[in-house]
Amino acid sequence: VMSKRYLRELVEKNIVDGWDDPRMPTLSGLRRRGYTPTSIFKFVKDAGISKADNLVDMRQLEAVLRAELELNAQRRVAVLDPVKLIIDNYPADQCEYFDLPNNPNRDANDSTTRKVAFTKELWIEKEDFAEVPPPKFKRLTLGSEVRLMGAYLVRCTGVDKDENGKVVAIHAEADLETRNGNPADGRKVRGTIHWVSCAHCLDAEVELYDKLFTESNMNSIPAVSYTHLRAHETLRHLV
């Protein structure tokens, strides 16, 4: 939707949080969502100019930005839906630091690193663990082994559950000989998951935005009908 009349209605009906809402296709909205001027210029150039109405997939704009950030953006780690991972064979009073690349893309020519603290208790994503894994699941399961990104190999040994059967903590043992690379016996590990130290991470407020409409072409829908809007599902607020 690019019509100013339609967009104004979204603002006036409080379906969005203003003209600079990151879900809006306005320049101020794109800027708040993280789009750079160069990515927008490149998208316009790639799309070309036409006298006829043309529908351009939003994924093309996303791809242009992704290609730029892949080379320019420094990486940081966030765990948005955490569950605790306890390394049982790691000393409770120990902390060591791993050097992780700020940009691992070889084409970025960025050799700088950052130090990331590693401790006995870590946060990982809930979706990176499954008691009953689906087919081809390559992350952490009971008895399986994964690589903690930039750190050790760990094998899951058990879980703690609350009175409702919900997993509240995962137990694992680390192969402390794998700090600098692959295991000496040459065994293959299928997956790598990201993590942060419970003691050293920072609290953050995160808003996750999705597309505003379920329809790819809103021009086919009457202006008075917003039954396809799903604004209430396109913003997730996490703390």
Language-model features: locations:
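Cytosolic catalytic cores of cyclic-nucleotide second-messenger enzymes
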Residues: 238
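Alpha-helical recognition segments enriched in aromatics with Gly/Pro capping
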Residues: 1-49
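C-terminal, non-catalytic macromolecule-binding modules
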Residues: 152-226
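Active-site-proximal acidic segments at structured loop/helix or strand boundaries
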Residues: 41, 50-140
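Conserved small/polar residues in nucleotide/adenosyl-binding loops
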Residues: 227-234
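N-terminal non-catalytic structural scaffold regions of very large proteins
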Residues: 145-148
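Hydrophobic alpha-helix feature that most strongly marks membrane-spanning transmembrane helices
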Residues: 35, 45-48, 66, 161-164, ...
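Short helix/loop capping segments that flank catalytic or ligand/cofactor-binding pockets
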Residues: 2-5, 38-41, 52-53, 93-99, ...
